[in-house]
Amino acid sequence: MTEFIPPGTRFHALPSPFPFKRGGALHGARVAYETWGTLAADASNAILIVTGLSPDAHAAANDANPAAGWWEGMVGPGKAIDTDRWFVVCVNSLGSCRGSTGPASLNPATGQPYRLDFPELSIEDGARAAIEVVRAQGIEQLACVVGNSMGGMTALAVLMLHPGIARSHVNISGSAQALPFSIAIRSLQREAIRLDPRWNGGHYDDDAYPESGMRMARKLGVITYRSALEWDGRFGRVRLDSDQTDDDPFGLEFQVESYLEGHARRFVRFFDPNCYLYLSRSMDWFDLAEYADGDVLAGLAKIRVEKALAIGANTDILFPVQQQQQVADGLRAGGADARFIGLESPQGHDAFLVDFERFCPAVRGFLDAL
């Protein structure tokens, strides 16, 4: 089992023990993070970024690691999240294999990876861990907490669990609860991993690794991350050249199949399967309705921020724009000046990672007005 930690990653030690919402605790755990910009003397210019399932804390290039980050188009000097103005902290989720303690990390009690002995992970656990990092920077209140995809859930959990922790919130392609369609897709992804004989109840290694299960899980994910509209225009029904196919009668034939295969093969050995299972399930479990007798809008209305922006792509099938509209409506009911923007982007759920032409102006406009 392997962890994948970018150069320049910083670490914060969590309180020990660190209890989990659903029971159990970690001892000697840590959270990975990176920072950009300069914290103001009164610590009033801090922004927290909480991420989706797979990203590390390296959202953008910085002095510690000049390599481009996963959100390079959004974060940096003069960009939408302007590090000349803001002090930005990006936290890798608890339960990940990219620096924060997760199932692939060594259990200090045994000297072996936690594997399935890792406590049942919830979005709220990741939110509490992120705030430990924020407090360690000397920040009592954030100017804004920004979350995308799973991070949109984490950001809402941060705001629910820590009243007054932020003056504003940007929710990008996120939600206050998992929808049945999303739960169904993620359940199939987890099943593909668990049915691979090499998963072996979580006891795999580099030589006996559930590669087939991870490939299928990733392909299913990529299908939900993009959109049919994009693929119609990008691939159509174009077939592969003869030198790109093999003798398998049911092998790859269309360009879109090759695209999925390439994405899957690039991912399978760079994300730990058990971490994937834990983080995926945490999204299915998350539901702000738990905080308001089963009413998700009432749960959102309990959150107190001054301003909020909820934004998404109209082609997103995993976190559809109705969920961002719901976030804005619920926060507005709680007294926030909340705005919803649905963008006409063809790139589905992943649009926030690639369609900077549409997403950056909305985020910049909101933050510039703070």
UniProtKB/Swiss-Prot annotation:
Protein name as annotated: Serine O-succinyltransferase
InterPro entries per record: AB_hydrolase_1, AB_hydrolase_fold, HAT_MetX-like
Subunit structure: Homodimer.
Subcellular location: Cytoplasm
GO terms, biological process: cysteine biosynthetic process from serine; homoserine metabolic process; methionine biosynthetic process
GO cellular component: cytoplasm
Family assignment from sequence similarity: Belongs to the AB hydrolase superfamily. MetX family.
Active-site feature positions: 149, 316, 349
Reactions catalysed according to its record: succinyl-CoA + L-serine = O-succinyl-L-serine + CoA; L-homoserine + succinyl-CoA = O-succinyl-L-homoserine + CoA
Pathway annotation: Amino-acid biosynthesis; L-cysteine biosynthesis; L-cysteine from L-serine: step 1/2
E.C. designation(s): 2.3.1.-, 2.3.1.46
Binding site for substrate: 218, 350
GO molecular function: homoserine O-acetyltransferase activity; homoserine O-succinyltransferase activity; L-serine O-succinyltransferase activity
Pfam family, one: Abhydrolase_1
Keyword terms: Acyltransferase, Amino-acid biosynthesis, Cysteine biosynthesis, Cytoplasm, Transferase
Marked site: Important for acyl-CoA specificity: 186
Domain AB hydrolase-1: from-to ranges: 46-355
Stored HAMAP family: MetX_acyltransf
Enzyme class: transferase
Function: Transfers a succinyl group from succinyl-CoA to L-serine, forming succinyl-L-serine. In vitro, also has homoserine succinyl transferase activity.
Highest taxon in the source lineage: Bacteria
PANTHER family reported in the protein's UniProt record: HOMOSERINE O-ACETYLTRANSFERASE
Stretches the record annotates as Important for substrate specificity: 52-55
